[in-house]
Amino acid sequence: MRPDLEQENLYYRKALKHPTVGLIGRNYLETRGITEETIDKWEIGWSPVGCIPSNFDKSDEFKPWTKLWGRITFPITSQSGEMASISGRQVIKIDNKPKYDHYAFSARKILFGLYQNKEDIQKEDRIIITEGQLDVISAWQNGLKIVASSFGAHCSLDHFAIISRYASVIDVIYDEDNAGWTGTQAVKDFSTWGDLIVNLRTGIFPAKEDLDSWIKTHSK
């Protein structure tokens, strides 16, 4: 683990809670229906853009990290619970940056949410793989605690090897767009699925919808 990841994650969590620094981030999470309980459970934070009020944090240990500016942040943990990276979901559009960004880590060997949900996944002997981190968090908040993210439509054989320790059934549910269809086809073309039962769930959501938006619509 990079030695300052815990420190940086704490900075983002404090920024989100700050009445002025975190306002944009909190407003965004409110529009997504994310509760305070969920924010605390998943250690969600906010990477503020530009100048920080002098009364935010005067401690020398906190520095103005910039890679994830304008993003809601999530710590990424391995299945053993060790923090491997921090990811950010874009809220403020900056240049041509991708929707999700993160510090380098071995994304082929980590699934977002597996650590938090592994007990339910083992109990149900089933896991749902989706693209976005907010899909996982929204599902958890609404009681569906067997979901993990492959950081986009990028499920790998390494992921399958890890999943096999917890579940025998995998439902791959990617977005109904080109990237989602490409990712689903890639899983279909794997050289082997081992002893896993893999369901490639296509055509479930209407165009431009994902698991997160579907859950919000059908949980009302």
Q: Positions of the model-derived regions?
A:
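RNase H-like polynucleotidyl transferase catalytic core
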Residues: 147-153, 196-207
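Phosphate-handling DNA/RNA-contact segment within nucleic-acid enzymes
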Residues: 1-2, 48-166, 183-184
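Metal-dependent DNA phosphodiester-chemistry modules and their immediately adjacent helices/loops
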Residues: 200-220
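Active-site-proximal loop/helix of nucleotide/amide-processing enzymes and allied scaffolds
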Residues: 156, 173, 179-189
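Non-catalytic accessory segments of DNA primases and related replication-initiation nucleases
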Residues: 1-62, 71, 83, 93-102, ...
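A residue-level signal for conserved active-site and pocket-lining positions in enzyme catalytic cores
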Residues: 29, 81, 172, 211
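Alpha-helical scaffold elements adjacent to nucleotide-binding pockets in ATP/GTP-utilizing enzyme cores
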Residues: 162, 186-190, 210, 214
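Acidic beta-strand-to-loop metal/phosphate-binding motif
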Residues: 129, 167-179, 203
